[in-house]
């Protein structure tokens, strides 16, 4: 079975790079640039993992946390990774409280992100 990923980031070059990277590794990959678009995809497709930026646009610092809540409510088996270049201990604590599976600080090499995604999906399949 091919795993399906959802990449949510407001920066197009990041979405394209991640989509290309994971597609070449055999994943089915969808992407969204904003929370509403991501939620529409989540209603229509089953994802093994969602990789979302914490801050999707200026002034919407909680978008990643809102996506996290939406996924955990509607798709509890889907793994969630939040990416951020901007964080604080309080935000990370709140993300963990809401059920994030992994918090990754940018920048992180794609190869390392790929290993983390693969490991997280494998853990989910074993539980």
Question: Where would I find each of the regions flagged by the language model?
Answer:
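Two-component signal transduction core modules
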Residues: 50, 80, 103-104
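Alpha4 helix (beta4-alpha4-beta5 surface) of REC/receiver domains from two-component response regulators
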Residues: 62-66, 86-104
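Acidic, metal-coordinating helix/loop segments flanking the phosphotransfer/catalytic sites
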Residues: 31-49, 57, 73
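C-terminal output helix
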Residues: 90, 108-118
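Two-component/phosphorelay signaling modules centered on CheY-like receiver
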Residues: 12-30
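The C-terminal output helix
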Residues: 115-127
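Short amphipathic alpha-helix used as the core "switch/output" element in two-component signaling
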Residues: 40, 62-77
């Amino acid at each position: 079975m091919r795993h399906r990923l959802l990449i949510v980031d407001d920066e197009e070059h990041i979405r394209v790079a991640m989509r290309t990277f994971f597609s070449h590794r055999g994943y089915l990959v969808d992407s969204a640039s904003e929370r509403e678009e991501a939620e529409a995809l989540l209603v229509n497709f089953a994802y093994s993992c969602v990789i979302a930026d914490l801050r999707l646009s200026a002034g919407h610092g909680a978008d990643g946390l809102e996506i996290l809540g939406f996924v955990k409510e509607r798709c509890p088996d889907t793994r969630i990774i939040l990416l951020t270049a901007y964080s604080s201990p309080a935000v990370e604590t709140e993300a963990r409280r809401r059920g994030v599976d992994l918090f990754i600080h940018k920048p992180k090499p794609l190869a390392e992100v790929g290993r983390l995604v693969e490991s997280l999906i494998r853990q989910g399949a074993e539980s």
